[in-house]
Amino acid sequence: LAFVLFAGILIGPFGSAARLFSQLKEAQGAMQRVFELLDTQPEVTDHPQAHTLPTIQGHVKFSGVDFTYDSRQPVLTDLSFEIQPGELVALVGPTGSGKSTIANLLHRFYDPTAGSIKLDGHDLREVTLESLYRQIAIVPQETILFGETIFENIRYGRESASEEDVIKASQVANAHDFITTLPDRYQTIIGEKGINLSGGQRQRIAIARAV
């Protein structure tokens, strides 16, 4: 009887130790993946003579652009087009036709295999990434919002932004009108992932943040 009681006492600690060991192994695997990510060298870097991109107007020119992912079939072949400043353009096509690739190339997440991409006459490979990223932004279809106020979500990209800056950005994104109808206006807590807002409202908040 004493042995059975003693074994019963030990089962709990041994079970906890086994669960802890399993959690530590999982954490070790996760940390290994984090370290591998941190050790990854960027494929796109600044050219030694790269210059700062001046304030852009928005003239985009693709000239004879080819692009291939990892030596696979070409995604883009001899693509050429121009977009004038202020012009609204929609890229339409089936899945895999290269729509996202064009956006990624414009943001210089990749460099083209051949041809050139120019913004206001500046080849993207000849300007610093920091000066490029400071002036352009992507608003994904799946918006990423935080369980904070509307004000903090819009200001997230530039914490030095004033209240006036935030309001101007929301006006550009056509978000100001619906924000002012909310009880707490810009101090409204939107919930995790913006759950308290509609899909369209979440998109406008994300656009305002990009602005």
Residue ranges and their predicted role:
Residues 36, 43, 155:
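Conserved E/DxxT/N motif and adjacent residues on the DHp alpha2 helix
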Residues 7, 31-34, 103, 175-176:
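Alpha-helical structural signal
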Residues 28-40, 59-63, 167:
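Extended non-transmembrane interhelical loops and adjacent amphipathic helices
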Residues 24, 41-44:
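Signal-transduction coiled-coil helices of two-component systems
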Residues 9-37:
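Cytosolic ends of transmembrane helices, especially the final helix of ABC transmembrane type-1 domains
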Residues 46-47, 51-211:
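ABC-type nucleotide-binding domain
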Residues 1-5:
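Membrane-water interface of transmembrane alpha-helices in multipass transporters/channels
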